[in-house]
């Protein structure tokens, strides 16, 4: 087979796996379509691929950057990293507010997926959801404070009691 045909097949398989992960993350209606465009021959081949997304039924798939919200982008990245976890060589993944715009049940699923990914990579996650924080191996409290007109960030590793108190504070 030609490299382009092999890429197309691999891209469809990849999109199917990512779609399955996104369904788990409370995005059951997402459609992912690999789109190939010819380009000047280079070390990566003669075409480039862009993943098009439709987050809601009836929408035409479009480039991710043009339609996905912050929460959708975060969950999509988490889904992609989950699919690639066994072959990816990234040592540390950072998710900053991966919980943006999601409900409690979706947050729990995101937390479970983060825990799964953490088996093959170190995961750092900034979250405001107790469902995610409760599933972490370690819990750091990050506080910003202003002193003498300057902002400082303080990061503290919480012990068991501190963690319980912080989870209670997050819940309200």
Where are these regions (language model features)?
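GG-anchored amphipathic helix commonly corresponding to the ABC/SMC/Rad50 NBD signature/C-loop
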Residues: 51, 55-57, 71-93, 117
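Walker B catalytic acidic pair
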Residues: 96-97
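Charged, surface-exposed helical/loop "interaction arms" that form contiguous linear patches used
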Residues: 1-40
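Flexible glycine-/small-residue-rich
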Residues: 34-38, 53-57, 80-82, 144, ...
């Amino acid at each position: 087979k030609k490299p382009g045909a092999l890429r197309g097949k691999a891209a469809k398989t990849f999109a199917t796996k990512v779609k399955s992960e996104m369904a788990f993350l409370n995005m059951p209606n997402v459609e992912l379509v690999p789109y190939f465009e010819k380009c000047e021959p280079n070390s990566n081949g003669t075409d480039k691929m862009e993943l098009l997304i439709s987050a809601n039924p009836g929408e035409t798939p479009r480039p991710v950057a043009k339609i996905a919200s912050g929460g959708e982008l975060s969950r999509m990245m988490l889904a992609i990293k989950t699919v690639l976890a066994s072959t990816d060589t990234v040592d540390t993944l950072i998710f900053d507010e991966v919980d943006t715009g999601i409900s409690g049940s979706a947050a729990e699923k995101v937390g479970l997926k983060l825990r799964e990914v953490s088996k093959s990579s170190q995961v750092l996650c900034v979250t405001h959801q107790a469902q995610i924080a409760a599933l972490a191996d370690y819990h750091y409290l990050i506080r910003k404070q202003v002193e003498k007109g300057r902002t400082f960030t303080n990061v503290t590793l919480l012990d068991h009691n501190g963690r319980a108190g912080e989870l209670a504070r997050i819940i309200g």
